[in-house]
Amino acid sequence: MAKITKTFQYGKHTVTLETGEIARQAGGAVIVKFDDTVLLVTAVAAKSAREGQDFFPLTVDYQEKFYAGGRIPGGFFKREGRATEKETLISRLIDRPIRPLFPEDYKNEVQIIATVMSMNPDIDGDIAALIGASAALSLAGTPFKGPIGAAKVGYKNGEYILNPTVTELKDSQLELVVAGTANAVLMVESEAELLSEEVMLGAVTFGHREMQKVINVINELTVEAGTKPSDWVAPAKNEGMIAALKEAVGDQLASAFQVRDKLQRRDAISAIKKDVLGALAPRATIEGWAAGDLAKEFGELEYQTMRGSVLSSKVRIDGRALDTVRPISAKAGVLPRTHGSALFTRGETQAIVITTLGTARDGQVIDAVSGEYKENFLFHYNFPPYSVGECGRFGAPKRREIGHGRLAKRGVLAVMPTLEEFPYTIRVVSEITESNGSSSMASVCGSSLALMDAGVPIKAPVAGIAMGLVKEGNDFVVLSDILGDEDHLGDMDFKVAGTAEGVSALQMDIKIEGITEEIMKQALQQAKAGRLHILGEMAHALTTPRQELSDYAPRLLTIKIHPDKIREVIGKGGSTIQAITKETGTQIDIQDDGTIIIASVNAIAAQAAKSRIEQITSDVEPGRIYEGKVAKIMDFGAFVTILPGKDGLVHVSQISSERVEKVGDKLKEGDLVRVKVLEVDKQGRIRLSIKAVEEGEGVQASAE
């Protein structure tokens, strides 16, 4: 195939899609150029599904190569290692709008790999990767109901910005990524500085409108490339098997969905499934029905039963009304030795959240393609298998945990103090101890309380809520505070976090087409009411940050010195600063601009270290009298330490008004003496006098 190129303007950027020259053995391969940021995105689909495959094995890997930024990786091996948090998050970002566009029965393995090969530090690779994945899948001839487009939206001075640069995002009140088809929005990911629901919805519609250009270009590319449509055909439904299954189930599932407790309901449904499949086993053997097909159709009956019940009765499977939030319990200060902690329970979802305060050196150093930087606010989310009553793998965080942690972090980011306002590294850990839907939003609520319990001066409390949707034709219901089953069997997962003032984070994943602006508007308004209710419940535990830090949290004292004085504080080979930290038991961080941060659990020790540093960095004043210690005896005089790291010379003629034949007759090393500064010359040498002090005191005594 000859090389095909498509170029278009997208916001301020020139975007080029190329295919037919590189990675020609892949099912679909596209070079995406976003100005100087260049990605190779490939898509390969297996020719057939594996025997017994009962799920869709889609894998998305986004990777940033260090050579893209002209850098060599750090570490011993000097090559890229496992995926970074950023790479994992962008991999999920690509997966989420693509997965629902494959047919339900398609089980062939599909792999998408997006490789950043050249990076302009001001242009991130996320939107280019989404566009490339859409184009590569469209070229691969898979049964992909795309293409999709993607756009990043910023907001400043009341105006939306299409695909803002990294620099522009620093001043933007919003960073929102939206992806979708020509007719529908499928995915939204955002963080905002407490914006209104109207502004957030406007950003989604703005991004969806602008991305139509991308969709049109990808369609043109596939036509020019001569891509053949997929010949995959969905397996025919076995109507006889489905009818027999429905007859055997009867109204048992409808009754099971009346059980309000999650675990009891799950046990009831499992028992029905076991009985029904057991009863149908003899006929299944005769008819040749596969056990996997029976189990799949039973799941479809579950899906239809729950949805039909909610749409017709407007009552949910746990008995709640559509807009009712589950009972909430919130407690702060639940762990005695931590710096801040909270227990947040909403129905059968529960999180223990802990805040730990550290110094600047506790920040995480990120070695990225665009350069090294330090992260001083860390948010970690853990989802152990016991939280859903199961056994399972336990260890390093999975992609889902990294994604949920990032969403929860986005929820509280807008209210966090700057490093200048609160010079601590802050780590928040959310331990999910029970889960039945919306554990990431429970993490937002719990982290808000834990931060306030730790004394972190956040601007306002934050709460989060997950919304759901059940839609059949024109009939739909929006659900507040969804359960796990409602998430699994519903058409939308719509998470909103924010304060009473506005939205701080919004994440939306839609499984069907046809979600209108009206539905999104209703979901946002219903979410606002739910969020305000949750904030009211949280207020029973804590409403403002505590004024005092925990007894176990480090106290930070900050002082500013002239950068030229830094070497005096450090001393030769680090001797001075090591002596201060050892004597006072403190931890001291010195920044290049002369900012010194002293950390200690003991406030008195921190103050002692501060006094030592102030003494070292203070200038010696001519004419002032100091008390010093004799450091060294010489034939011509004695060196006296008047301040830490500052020695001056008392010449033999300045030791006494009497004639001194031998310095050692008058002074010994270690003696404490009072000296007057006679002069500090241009080279910083200090001339001292003991005689001048004695003469001055003599004159004063005579006057009295």
Swiss-Prot record:
Localization terms from the record: Cytoplasm
InterPro entries, alphabetized: ExoRNase_PH_dom1, ExoRNase_PH_dom2, ExoRNase_PH_dom2_sf, KH_dom, KH_dom_type_1, KH_dom_type_1_sf, NA-bd_OB-fold, PNPase
Sample GO molecular function, one term: RNA binding
Pfam family, one: S1
GO cellular component: cytosol
Principal cellular location given in the protein's record: cytoplasm
Entry keyword Amino-acid biosynthesis: no
Boundaries of every KH domain copy: 554-613
Catalytic activity: RNA(n+1) + phosphate = RNA(n) + a ribonucleoside 5'-diphosphate
Positions that bind Mg(2+): D487, D493
CC cofactor: Mg(2+)
A biological process term (GO) from this entry: RNA processing
EC number(s) from the headed UniProt entry: 2.7.7.8
UniProt keyword annotations, A-Z: Cytoplasm, Magnesium, Metal-binding, Nucleotidyltransferase, RNA-binding, Transferase
Tagged with keyword Metal-binding: yes
All residue ranges annotated as the S1 motif domain in the record: 623-691
Membership in a protein family: Belongs to the polyribonucleotide nucleotidyltransferase family.
Function: Involved in mRNA degradation. Catalyzes the phosphorolysis of single-stranded polyribonucleotides processively in the 3'- to 5'-direction.
Classification via NCBIfam families: polynuc_phos, PRK11824.1
Subunit structure, as described in the record: Component of the RNA degradosome, which is a multiprotein complex involved in RNA processing and mRNA degradation.
Protein name: Polyribonucleotide nucleotidyltransferase
Biological source species: Xanthomonas euvesicatoria pv. vesicatoria (strain 85-10) (Xanthomonas campestris pv. vesicatoria)
Gene: pnp
